[in-house]
Regions:
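Extracellular glycan-associated modules
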Residues: 21-219
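Residue-level detector of functional hotspots within protein domains
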Residues: 6, 39, 64, 71, ...
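Extracellular, repeat-based ectodomains that mediate carbohydrate processing or recognition
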Residues: 218-661
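Bacterial N-terminal signal peptides that target proteins for export
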Residues: 1-7
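Basic/polar N-terminal segments that are highly enriched at the extreme N-terminus
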Residues: 1, 17-22, 208, 212-226, ...
Length: 661
């Protein structure tokens, strides 16, 4: 070892022992655009390379990438995932290995480094070796771009800061990693240095490496994910969840393009355009993937727009279905969900107000069961589920959907819960159940309600008592009705308001999760706040827990429900024949005033209510076979109960739907 090397080693060790000073400033990554070095410029050594960077994140639970080459799970990635920092290497074709370290604390600078030598992956935290994993092999030859702060141009964006980012075409020794952590530069640390990016590197739309590094990362347009093409017709996704060994085959299944009740809203009437815009989960003729589709009904002409294919979610899971919002300026927002944390979620905005021809990707991250609400003059109050030890109910707020407040947990009772929400006059309310500890998600019970009148800053019970959040115990002031001791499951369907702002909640209760008569009765039930107490009344019955339809509060005493309450061609599977029910005494008595479909080929499922629903486009749903894969068609109805089927083949910009006899 040379005297120079010994001096460097001594300096490294002394610096590491003393502790390094975190950077004063870094490069800000807000998810608004990706940065990448073109693949032709990268040329990583397939058996010897190293990464290092200071990291400061806003949230250490989100999946976020520091440096990446290749698609997810390929080539190499230095990233935060599932609460750990990973150094991943695809050391054999189609097979990857990783080493991982503890995550950074939100808002605090932490230094990470990773290396690979053809035999071992190492990851370092604050200058010290944190983990190593055997991974004999090498990277495949490639010309993939090196992304900084994201997986690619639309996924897993870093939300925070990076500083002193370095890339080498060799494997650094432990002592050299300690020196980098200590802020050392030059000498041996310049050997095979491909890139060093600091706050001084940013030059408009480029990150120019400090010498002797040569790589330049360029700002890319965000959004190659988006398709923005016209569909050839209206095709809904078919999906099933959990096979069951009986004649009903699945826990739930069918044409689920408008699934589920916890994805709200899926349609929105815009008065200035006199159009109801809607989204749904679409597919191709093979049901091979889930497309997010956007269309509208023109109330002036009675015609429907040829749907726009927004994006391919690369799954057939209907839990990834989209929802829609429209802001004060008429821009259409599509929130693309994910089932859990394994896939990314997206937010897109129309390029023009009241126009579906082109959308632009605005944000990528993760959320499930999306319930965003544009609150006039305030912005977006986004209720959603985040999978962390169950199904916690969370919220964000934002003015532009690019920058969000820190995710705030509202409730996580035992194993979590599901919710339904809707806007009232100057407020937003949510009704939810809970999953009892130790029993799993198939068990859900009890009914709760809370609301906010100040854009989510505080939340109150229905009688105005401010809640201490998050709600963590099943016995709490938000409780509407207790069902656990009665061994009744509670399935959330809808919430609406009367003229005084009093909420009315719609649920279905049952004896258990499995399809079939053993868990009868499935009872549609309303819970109305009278101003002094909850008035809970049973309405009528159907044959499946996942029979879903909305509650239309047309006056303080006249309410309407449109849903698949009548047995369909696949009885005891989700959905059935659509019927219209009416009460004129605030839920005391209900009458089925019209059976809207009959002798159907498939069950009809998940009727959805537009925001500001208009009489000529009052609800939208899909159909599909309840016990085997099938095609799925889309329908809408008017307030009178007439049903219209959207065409499976569309070639013109605007089309008429077929009215059913």
């Amino acid at each position: 070892m040379t005297i120079r090397s010994l001096s460097l080693l001594a300096c490294c060790l002394l610096s590491a022992l003393a502790g390094a000073e975190p950077p004063a400033t870094g490069l800000v990554f807000d998810g608004s655009h990706p940065w990448a070095v073109p693949g032709k410029d990268v040329a990583l050594n397939p058996t010897a390379f190293s990464f290092a960077t200071w990291v400061r994140v806003q949230d250490n639970k989100e999946s976020q990438v520091f440096l990446n080459q290749g698609k997810a799970g390929t080539l190499t990635s230095f990233y935060l995932y599932n609460g750990k920092v990973r150094m991943l290497v695809e050391n054999k074709p189609g097979s990857y290995t990783f080493a991982m370290a503890e995550p950074p604390q939100p808002g605090e600078w932490t230094h990470y480094a990773g290396s690979y030598d053809g035999q071992t992956i190492r990851v370092y935290r604050n200058g010290k070796l944190a983990a190593k994993t055997k991974a004999a092999g090498s990277l495949a030859k490639n010309k993939a771009s090196l992304f900084v702060g994201s997986l690619n141009d639309f996924e897993r964006f870093l939300k925070g800061d990076l500083a002193d980012i370095r890339v080498w075409n060799r494997t650094l020794a432990d002592s050299e990693i300690a020196a980098v952590y200590a802020g050392e530069t030059g000498g041996e640390l310049d050997n095979e240095l491909l890139a060093r990016w600091t706050a001084e590197s940013k030059q408009d739309t480029q990150l120019a490496s400090l010498p002797p590094g040569t790589l330049t990362a360029r700002q890319l347009k965000m959004g190659s994910l988006l398709i923005n093409e016209k569909a050839d017709g209206f095709h809904g996704i078919w999906y099933y969840n959990q096979k069951i060994p009986n004649e009903y085959v699945y826990k739930y299944s069918g044409g689920l393009g408008t699934y589920c009740a916890k994805h709200i809203p899926m349609a929105w009437y815009a008065p200035k355009a006199n159009k109801t815009f809607f989204c749904y989960g679409g597919t191709d003729e093979q049901n091979s993937t889930l497309y997010h589709m956007v269309s509208y009904y023109d109330h002036a002409t009675g015609m429907v727009a040829r749907p726009t294919v927004l994006l391919d979610k690369k799954t057939t899971d209907a839990h990834d279905n989209p929802v829609i919002n429209i802001d004060d300026d008429g821009y259409i927002w599509i929130f693309s969900s994910s089932h859990g944390t394994g896939r990314p979620s997206y937010i897109s905005r129309s390029a023009k107000p009241y126009d579906i021809d082109k959308f632009e990707l605005v944000w990528t991250g993760n959320f499930s069961y999306p319930q965003p609400w544009y609150m006039p003059g305030q912005g977006f109050l986004f209720l959603h589920t985040y999978y962390k030890g169950g199904r916690g109910l969370n919220m964000w707020t934002s003015q532009d959907c690019k920058t969000w407040t820190k995710r705030r947990l509202l409730s996580h009772i035992e194993m979590g819960q599901y919710q339904v929400s809707f806007r009232g006059d100057g407020k937003l309310g949510t009704a939810f159940n809970m999953h009892p500890a130790g029993k799993g998600l198939n068990w859900r019970t009890n009914l709760y309600y809370m609301e906010t009148k100040d854009f989510g800053k505080t939340w109150q019970t229905v009688d105005g008592k401010t809640l201490d959040l998050p709600i963590l115990k099943k016995d709490n002031p938000a409780l509407v009705a207790e069902y656990q001791s009665k061994a009744r499951n509670v399935y959330m369907k809808d919430v609406s308001y009367d003229s005084k702002g009093n909420p009315i909640i719609l649920v279905v209760t049952s004896g258990g999760y499995a399809s079939g008569p053993a868990n009868d009765p499935r009872t549609w039930t309303t819970a109305r706040w009278t101003g002094s107490e909850w008035d809970i009344r049973e309405a009528f019955k159907s044959d499946n827990n996942y029979d879903t339809g909305p509650l239309y509060v047309e006056s303080d005493t006249t309410w309407r429900i449109i849903g698949p309450t009548q047995p369909g061609p696949q009885p005891y599977n989700p959905g059935g024949e659509i019927a219209m029910w009416l009460t004129k005494d605030a839920g005391a008595h209900w009458e089925m005033v019209k059976q809207m479909t009959a002798n159907s080929e498939f069950n009809h499922t998940y009727v959805r209510r537009p925001v500001n629903a208009q009489p000529d486009f009052y609800g939208i749903w899909a159909d599909g076979h309840g016990r085997q894969p099938s095609k799925s068609r889309l329908y809408y109805c008017n307030q009178a109960g007439d049903v219209f089927r959207l065409p499976e083949v569309v070639t013109e910009p605007m089309v008429k739907a077929e009215k059913l006899d």
